[in-house]
């Protein structure tokens, strides 16, 4: 049996741009992609904390160190610059792998800089926000 498991998460990213006229996808700073174990063209779920929208797209790399989180194409209608989003990828694992798997989770501040990372989330924990 295979299981679909949470593979990685970029928590509380700040949307920097929304580009309706681009072909599609989400642009993510390549440094953040590396830290969260997200690959170019990987399917990703976007959860908008501001309006509750949940949708899927694929990832394209943005300039390293830029902090860019840009929703492109039709997805640009579901976010506004400044919105807080959670970006989640999933993997398919056999039962033994799934039982050993620990996702990669990074937490960002308001400028999309990494402030913490984790390998396991616990119910009831409040994530670091990076807000003063």
From Swiss-Prot:
Indicate where the modification Pyruvic acid (Ser) is found in the sequence.
25
Q: Name one Pfam family in it.
A: Asp_decarbox
Q: Name one GO molecular function term.
A: aspartate 1-decarboxylase activity
The note describing how and how many cofactors are bound reads: Binds 1 pyruvoyl group covalently per subunit.
Metabolic or biological pathway = Cofactor biosynthesis; (R)-pantothenate biosynthesis; beta-alanine from L-aspartate: step 1/1
What processes does the entry annotate via GO biological process terms? Answer: alanine biosynthetic process; pantothenate biosynthetic process
Q: Name one GO cellular component term.
A: cytosol
Q: Which cofactor does it need?
A: pyruvate
- Kindly state which keywords UniProt assigns to this record, in alphabetical order: Autocatalytic cleavage, Cytoplasm, Decarboxylase, Lyase, Pantothenate biosynthesis, Pyruvate, Schiff base, Zymogen
Name the residues that bind substrate: 57, 73-75
Which residues carry out catalysis?
Answer: 25, 58
The superkingdom listed in its UniProt entry is: Bacteria
InterPro entries of this UniProt entry?
Asp_de-COase-like_dom_sf, Asp_decarbox
* Keyword Cytoplasm applies: yes
Q: What's the Enzyme Commission number for this chain?
A: 4.1.1.11
Kind of enzyme, top EC level? lyase
**PTM section of the record:** Is synthesized initially as an inactive proenzyme, which is activated by self-cleavage at a specific serine bond to produce a beta-subunit with a hydroxyl group at its C-terminus and an alpha-subunit with a pyruvoyl group at its N-terminus.
* Localization annotation: Cytoplasm
Is this entry keyworded Lyase?
Answer: yes
As its record notes, the protein acts as a catalyst of:
L-aspartate + H(+) = beta-alanine + CO2
Q: What is its main location?
A: cytoplasm
State the family it belongs to: Belongs to the PanD family.
Q: Tell me, in a sentence or two, what this protein's role is.
A: Catalyzes the pyruvoyl-dependent decarboxylation of aspartate to produce beta-alanine.
Tell me the subunit arrangement.
Heterooctamer of four alpha and four beta subunits.
What name has this protein been given in UniProt?
Aspartate 1-decarboxylase
């Amino acid at each position: 049996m295979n299981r679909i498991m949470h593979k990685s998460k970029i928590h509380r990213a700040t949307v920097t741009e929304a580009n309706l006229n681009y072909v599609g996808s989400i642009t993510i700073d390549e440094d953040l992609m590396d830290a969260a174990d997200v690959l170019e063209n990987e399917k990703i779920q976007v959860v908008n904390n501001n309006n509750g929208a949940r949708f899927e797209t694929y990832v394209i790399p943005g300039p390293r160190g830029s902090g860019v989180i840009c929703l492109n194409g039709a997805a640009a209608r579901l976010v506004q610059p400044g919105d807080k989003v959670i970006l989640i990828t999933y993997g398919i694992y056999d039962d033994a792998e799934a039982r050993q798997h620990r996702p990669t989770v990074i937490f960002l501040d308001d400028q999309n800089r990494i402030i913490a990372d984790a390998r396991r989330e616990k119910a009831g924990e409040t994530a670091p926000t990076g807000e003063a």
